Regions:
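N-terminal signal-anchor transmembrane segment
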Residues: 1-57, 72-81
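Hydrophobic, aromatic-rich transmembrane alpha-helices
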Residues: 1-4, 43-58, 186-195, 331-339
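Interfacial loop-to-transmembrane-helix boundary motif in multi-pass membrane proteins
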Residues: 12-14, 66-71, 101-149
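Long extracytoplasmic/lumenal interhelical loops at the membrane interface
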Residues: 27-33, 256-330
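A membrane-periplasm/extracellular boundary helix in multi-pass inner-membrane enzymes
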Residues: 80, 133-136, 230-271
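Interfacial juxtamembrane loops and adjacent helix segments
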Residues: 138-171, 303-320, 325
């Protein structure tokens, strides 16, 4: 057993894993297990750069180096324009990403980073699913509570955490700040696995395990994923859909509150013109209004979440137009330039 895991017990894999848990939306620092995420980001940056220098990792081609420089100077410009030091966090993370990419290139372009990420998401999805079944069976209770970043209570169950635990309803957030975050990053893991790693076991475990997030967005994104990759294999689509529905019904059948809380989220809400579980459309509309008011350079990342903006436009949480509202057209170009 030890012989199988010994190749992974080295600094490189520690660096990979630390990059997954160093900061928000992971909650380890909120539970007091790690320093504040800003400290973790600096530590991650120093460790990644030190590894690159000590191992003398090779350089990227000039176009890639130029892209990194444009982004770095672009965010410095935004920090000065908006008087916002949070843009320096982006620079640190950008340079850290650059360093980790160089490490992977030095390893012959291996997929070790992607594989490690996929396994980490599978662990959260499956352990959370097991934990939820134990909670619903009355065999598991919260070990302790902690305060989430938005000041709501979070619950640590040992196998998973969640910010949704009331009235018989419990959802798996893994070790992220909310179930939707686990579902969001889980979809990334699915796509990475399908396109590069191609591990069928990982794919099945992710698809089934992420059901425990009970995220409406997950099921919408999963439907798109299945149509893109399995549209020519109708029997697989039917089989996967059947497994998902049976698993869902099994989980939600434990109590009436959970059943209505989940299936009720797919009911049409006439007051909003969308399904009851849609909690992003309003946020997207607000951010789109802000973008229309500040189209070129945006409002600034920190300004966007200020009380003044909340009183004028309403609360703006994570959504597709958040970065557009914060950074405008110029910021969007800088962000998506590597694509």
């Amino acid at each position: 057993m030890f012989e199988k895991i010994r190749p992974y017990l080295n600094f490189r894999y520690f660096l990979y894993f630390f990059s997954f848990i160093a900061g928000w939306p992971c909650v380890f620092y909120l539970m007091g297990w790690l320093p504040h995420y800003t400290v973790n980001y600096v530590l991650l940056f120093v460790m990644a750069m030190s590894y690159v220098i000590i191992r003398k990792c090779g350089q990227f081609d000039k176009p890639i180096n130029d892209l990194i420089l444009i982004q770095v100077f672009g965010w410095i410009f935004f920090s000065l324009i908006h008087m916002d030091t949070s843009y320096y966090t982006r620079i640190i993370l950008l340079l850290t990403t650059f360093a980790i990419l160089r490490i992977q290139q030095d390893e012959g372009g291996s997929l070790d980073f992607c594989k490690t990420y996929d396994v980490w998401l599978v662990v959260q999805a499956i352990s959370g699913t097991i934990g939820i079944l134990l909670v619903l069976g009355g065999l598991l209770q919260p070990i302790f509570k902690f305060v989430e970043m938005d000041m709501r209570p979070g619950y640590f169950f040992g196998l998973f955490t969640t910010n949704t635990y009331f009235g018989g309803l419990v959802r798996n957030a893994g070790f992220y700040d909310e179930p939707g975050a686990l579902a969001f990053w889980g979809i990334y893991a699915l796509i990475i696995n399908k396109m590069f790693v191609k591990n069928t076991k990982i794919e099945i475990l992710l698809i089934v395990g992420l059901i425990s997030t009970m995220s409406v967005a997950y099921f919408i994104q999963l439907a798109i994923y299945l149509l893109v990759f399995y549209r020519k294999q109708s029997w697989k689509l039917i089989m996967i859909a059947a497994v998902i529905l049976i698993t869902l019904k099994f989980i939600t059948s434990y109590n009436e509150a959970m059943d209505s809380a989940f299936w009720g989220r797919f009911q049409y809400d006439e007051s909003t013109g969308t399904i009851s579980g849609d909690n992003r459309s309003v946020l997207m509309e607000r951010c789109w209004r802000i973008f229309c008011d500040y189209p070129i350079l945006g409002m600034g990342a920190r300004n966007l979440v200020s009380p003044e903006v909340a009183s004028k436009y309403g609360f703006v949480g994570a959504n597709f137009f958040f970065n557009w509202a914060a950074d405008g057209i110029v910021g969007a170009i800088i962000t998506y330039l590597p694509l």
